[in-house]
């Protein structure tokens, strides 16, 4: 038995109800708390490198640290900028919270796409992502969180994957890396 006979009838009935009914349909988009929370600027700083751009940031116990990427295709050294996170400096002296503390320009952190802070080692780990220097493929750059000076480079895997996101999970004393592979994302622990 073929039920194709009823198909045109149900199609016409569906079209009739869609276009000639008085039903009101509405939709809403849920907004993020970040969109509805009141924001206020707490500080402003002059630009240190006019050709660079803010690429990533993280917070340590003492500072809010920003990475200013110096160049897209070259190996110019990037700048790490520290702003005071607290109302006192590391020695207990009063400072203006969120004011400029210091900056360091010494190393190319490649694209510097992600940063995280490890309070156990007092180090910042920077995921490079794109690499202009082939020896930086798959590298994570380690920086002293108190001085912002480069300490070492850690090669993860065989260098075939570049990492563009990094986080530190204190409860597990573990880093989480995010890699962009063809058509998907991968997380490495």
Predicted regions and their residues:
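Sec-dependent signal peptide cleavage junction
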Residues: 17-29
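A short helix->beta-strand "capping" segment at the edge of beta-propeller domains
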Residues: 28-50, 98-99
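Beta-strand-rich domains and repeat architectures in extracellular enzymes and scaffolds
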Residues: 45-76
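Repeated scaffold domains used in trafficking and secretory/extracellular systems
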Residues: 50-58, 107-116, 158-169
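Short coil/turn segments that connect the beta-strands within blades of beta-propeller domains
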Residues: 61-62, 120-122, 172-175
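Short loop/turn segments immediately following the C-termini of beta-strands
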Residues: 69-72, 128-131, 179-183
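Structural motif
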Residues: 74-84, 133-142, 183-189
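Blade-loop segments of beta-propeller domains
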Residues: 90-121, 128
């Amino acid at each position: 038995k073929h039920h194709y006979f009823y198909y045109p009838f149900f199609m016409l009935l569906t079209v009739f109800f869609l276009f000639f009914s008085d039903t009101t349909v509405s939709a809403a988009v849920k907004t993020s708390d970040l969109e509805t929370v009141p924001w206020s600027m707490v500080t402003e700083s002059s630009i240190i490198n006019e050709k660079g751009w803010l690429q990533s940031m993280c917070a340590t116990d003492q500072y809010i640290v920003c990475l200013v990427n110096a160049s897209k295709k070259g190996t110019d050294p990037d700048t790490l900028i520290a702003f005071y996170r607290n109302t006192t400096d590391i020695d207990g002296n009063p400072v203006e919270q969120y004011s400029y503390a210091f900056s360091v320009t010494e190393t190319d952190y490649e694209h510097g796409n992600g940063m995280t802070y490890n309070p156990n080692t007092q180090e910042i780990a920077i995921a490079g992502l794109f690499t202009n220097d082939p020896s930086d493929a798959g590298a994570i750059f380690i920086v002293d969180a108190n001085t912002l000076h480069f300490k070492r480079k850690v090669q993860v895997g065989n260098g075939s994957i570049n990492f563009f996101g990094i986080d530190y999970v204190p409860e597990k004393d573990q880093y989480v890396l995010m890699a962009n592979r063809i058509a998907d994302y991968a997380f490495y622990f």
